[in-house]
């Protein structure tokens, strides 16, 4: 969507009239406006997209930082912690609100969630460009075998990683988004740029829904869990017990551990639920 904010010579505008018109159009008042805040010309506006108090943004930094953290990357704990609690370093909640960040780990571009934990490298040979198209910065991990395998340990680990990603996404503050088919392990067979594929590579394989019911039910449970705990959304009033709206924890309470090899982040969301007339406390561990 960033291309919509450039002027005649390609210079980014501070107040693009088209984006402003869309934001202020009365007919679109009840419509969700969501921007993929970058373009093919290299303009990257995550956290700086002209929002006019209406536009939300795909948070590409959430995708990158969470992918790196979930596969065990070093020195990324402090960044993952920020993404978990709503990316306040990118979106000031007092200015942009608490739902400006569209959190995602996968989307229509790139690997599916199953492929993210099945391939270390892209496999776009079928596109006809000698595997040169598509992004190379996938931050993926094949869990011990590249692509299709019958190894039960690898298959079990892949499903664990998918559950880790799902649980992380749905307990993060912000607005969650996941790719259709991720809830039943849909695959593109390692193709991370299937724009030209109208076949089994890009189609949803609904037969996998029955095969991977455990993953499907886990997604359903996590969606229910998120709806059940409004404190995760940041929509509650301040907690009467005095707990902070959001806090991070490590080995010691209220002390986040973000060292080189930090592997666990704990966040606590708190607030007063006016509907239930009591404090609501939610916890997330990644």
Regions found by a protein language model. Name each.
Residues 284-286:
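Conserved small/polar residues in nucleotide/adenosyl-binding loops
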Residues 6-14:
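Short, flexible/disordered intra-domain loops and linkers
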Residues 209-247:
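Catalytic cores of secreted or luminal carbohydrate-active enzymes
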Residues 188-220:
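Extended hydrophobic/aromatic segments used for targeting, binding, or gating
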Residues 96, 257-263:
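A short catalytic or substrate-binding loop motif that flags glycine-/basic-rich loops and adjacent residues
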Residues 13-180, 184, 193-197, 230-237, ...:
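Conserved alpha/beta catalytic core and glycan-binding cleft of carbohydrate-active enzymes
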Residues 1-4:
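Active-site groove signature of glycoside hydrolases
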């Amino acid at each position: 969507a960033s291309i919509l904010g450039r002027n005649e010579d390609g210079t980014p505008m501070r107040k693009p009239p088209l984006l402003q018109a869309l934001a202020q159009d009365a007919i679109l008042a009840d419509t969700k406006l969501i921007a993929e805040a970058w373009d093919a010309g290299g303009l990257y506006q995550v956290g700086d997209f002209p929002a006019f108090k209406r536009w939300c943004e795909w948070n590409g930094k959430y995708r990158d930082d969470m992918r790196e953290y979930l596969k065990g990357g070093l020195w990324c704990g402090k960044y993952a912690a920020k993404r978990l609690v709503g990316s306040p370093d990118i979106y000031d909640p007092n200015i942009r609100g608490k739902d400006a960040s569209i959190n995602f780990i996968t989307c229509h571009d790139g690997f599916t969630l199953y492929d993210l934990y099945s391939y270390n490298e892209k496999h776009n040979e079928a596109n006809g460009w000698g595997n040169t198209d598509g992004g190379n910065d996938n931050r993926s991990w094949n869990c011990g075998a590249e692509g299709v395998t019958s190894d039960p340990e690898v298959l079990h680990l892949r499903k664990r990683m998918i559950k880790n990603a799902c649980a992380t996404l749905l307990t993060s503050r912000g607005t969650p988004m996941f790719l259709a088919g991720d809830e039943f392990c849909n695959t593109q067979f390692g193709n991370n740029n299937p724009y030209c594929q109208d076949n089994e590579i890009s189609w949803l394989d609904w037969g996998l829904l029955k095969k991977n019911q455990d993953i499907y039910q886990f997604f359903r449970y996590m969606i229910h869990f998120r709806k059940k705990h409004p404190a995760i959304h940041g929509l509650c009033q301040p907690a009467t017990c005095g707990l902070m709206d959001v806090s991070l924890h490590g080995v010691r309470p209220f002390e986040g551990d973000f060292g080189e090899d930090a592997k666990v982040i704990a966040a606590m969301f708190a607030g007063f639920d006016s509907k239930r007339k009591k404090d609501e406390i939610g916890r997330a561990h990644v």
